[in-house]
Amino acid sequence: MSDLLHKLNFKIADASPEYKQRRKIQMIRFFTASAVTIFASRFAYRATVSRQYIPTLFQGNHSPPLSYNFTTDAAVAVGTGTLLCGSVTGMTVFGLCWILDVSNIKEFGWRMKSMLGGWESEKKLSEAPMDEESSYIQDSLNDILDGKYDFENDTEEVAGELKTN
């Protein structure tokens, strides 16, 4: 197989076995979600066709028969709609993960951040000058974390002032 890939000049021929296994798992997830979507759509189609009301020759088509149950019909419609929505969403997500070579949520965040220019924006923001109020707050927090303030004495002084008032 590798010889054929080298002959056809595919870059994946030089990839590591771990990378090939990772891509294979992504592909299997996508095709599994696609198969579930196909089965769900067939199920929804059959559920719709079986509930279809076809009047007889001299029956009006504006009034359904008396034995018709609207509650069951609504429940089946909600169930099949949810099933279709979930399966199509899964197929879309796994397809995008396969295309973008993403295996988990953290990788997806990194990939989106790099694609949307987040690294450059973060670098520009870190190089921007800090205003006076923000630097004062940052210095105060750093002093608190370094232990430059003694809060035990401050609370005793405040308690003494409250007793005198």
Swiss-Prot record:
Question: InterPro entries this protein is in?
Answer: AIM11 (IPR038814)
Principal subcellular localization:
membrane
Residues folding into a coiled coil are: none
Give me the Gene Ontology terms describing cellular component. membrane; mitochondrion
Q: Report the subcellular localization.
A: Membrane
Q: How does it sit in the membrane?
A: Multi-pass membrane protein
Q: Which UniProt keywords apply?
A: Membrane, Transmembrane, Transmembrane helix
Q: Which residues cross the membrane?
A: 27-49, 78-100
Q: Which PANTHER family match?
A: ALTERED INHERITANCE OF MITOCHONDRIA PROTEIN 11 (PTHR39136:SF1)
Family of the protein in this entry: Belongs to the AIM11 family.
Protein name, per record: Altered inheritance of mitochondria protein 11
Organism from which the protein derives: Candida albicans (strain WO-1)
Q: Which gene encodes it?
A: AIM11
